[in-house]
Amino acid sequence: MSQVTVADPRSADDVLEVNKTPKTLFVVVDGIPADVIERVSTPGIDAVVARGSYQRAYVGGDRGMPTESPTVSAVGYMSLLTGTWSNKHNVRANYGIEPNYDFWDIFRVAKHQARAVSTGLFSTWTDNRTILMGDGLEAAGGYKFDFVADGFEKDPAFAPAFENVERIQAVDLQVTTLAAKTILESAPDLSWVYLQHTDDIGHRDGDGPSMDLAVRWIDARVLELWAAVQARSQQFVNEDWLVIVTTDHGRTSLNGKGHGGQSDRERTIWIASNSPRMVSPADRSAAIVDIYPTIVEHMRFDMPEEVAAQLEGQSLLSM
C-alpha cells in the first residue's frame, strides 16, 4: 500500500516538543450531555482543560444524509475509533454488531507503523475489544493489544455482592486503577479508557441529582488518570502526552433517560483536551470523527492512502 505521512506543522520554536516521544490517552465517559458536564463541578476534567481546551462537538453524522448515525454507545465508539460514520463502519446498535473492518480503527493504524507502537485498552465493556476492534481477527488486521484490562463485567466472581449499576461502577473503578498503574509504569504509546457508570445512571434515573453525583464520581476517575499522566511526565520528560476526554452521545431532553435519536441534545457531545493547539470552536465545528485524525497527527502516524481517503473527520490540531 502507498503511504500518507502526516506532516507536523509546528514551528521551529516547537522543535523540542517534536523531538519528544508522542503518547496519547483518550478517555470515553459514557452518556454525559454537554449541558450537564458544563454545569456540574468537574475538577478532573477542569485540570485537563487548564492545559488545553474544551469545546462542544457532535455525533450522529449529518441529519437526513447517508452518514446519519444512531446516537447510541457502540456507534459513538466506532465513529471515534474509525473516523467514519455508520454508513461506513456498519455499527448501528449495541447488539448484533457486525463491523466493517475495511475501515481501519486507530489501533490498527498504530500497529501498521514501521516503528514499534505499544497499545493499551482499559474497558468496562469487553465487546469494545473483541467485537468492535476484532481483537486478533485477520479481517480486522490481526493485531493484539499490548496491555488489556477488561472482562470484569463478564466475570461472575468480580464484585458478586453488587447488582447491576453498582457492580458496573465497581468495574469502572477497577479499570481506572489498572489503567492509571499501567500508564505510570509502562506508558503505552496509545491507550483508550472506557467507563460506563454515568450512562447506567442516566438510563435508570435520568437528569437530576443522581446523574450529577455520577458525573462527579466519574470525573474523579478522570482525575486519577490525569494524575498518572502528570506523574509519568515528570519522571519521563521526553514524553509528549495528548490527553482527550469525551463522551459518546448526549441524552433526550424530556428526562435524560434515553438516547439514540437526532435531537440536538442527543447529538451534542464535548471534547476536553490538554492540548493548547486545538482549534477554536469559532473557526469550525468539531465532531467525534475528528478525534481519530487528531491522534494521527499528534502521534505522527503514517497511513495507507486508502485509509486516509476514507476518513470523515479532520484533525483538531491547529498550526
Language-model region placement:
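Substrate-binding rim/cap in mid-to-C-terminal beta-strand-loop elements of soluble/periplasmic
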Residues: 75-77, 81-84, 259-303, 317
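Metal-dependent active-site segment of extracytoplasmic phospho-/sulfohydrolases and closely related
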Residues: 25-26, 44-45, 217-259, 295
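Short, structured active-site-proximal loop/turn typified by the sulfatase FGly-forming signature C/S-X-P-X-R
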Residues: 35-72, 83, 120
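Active-site-proximal N-terminal segment of extracellular/periplasmic enzymes that hydrolyze or transfer
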Residues: 4-54
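Active-site rim elements
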Residues: 92-97, 209-212, 277-286, 304-305
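Catalytic-site neighborhoods of secreted/periplasmic enzymes
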Residues: 87, 91-163
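Active-site His/acidic residue clusters
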Residues: 134-137, 149-151, 177-224
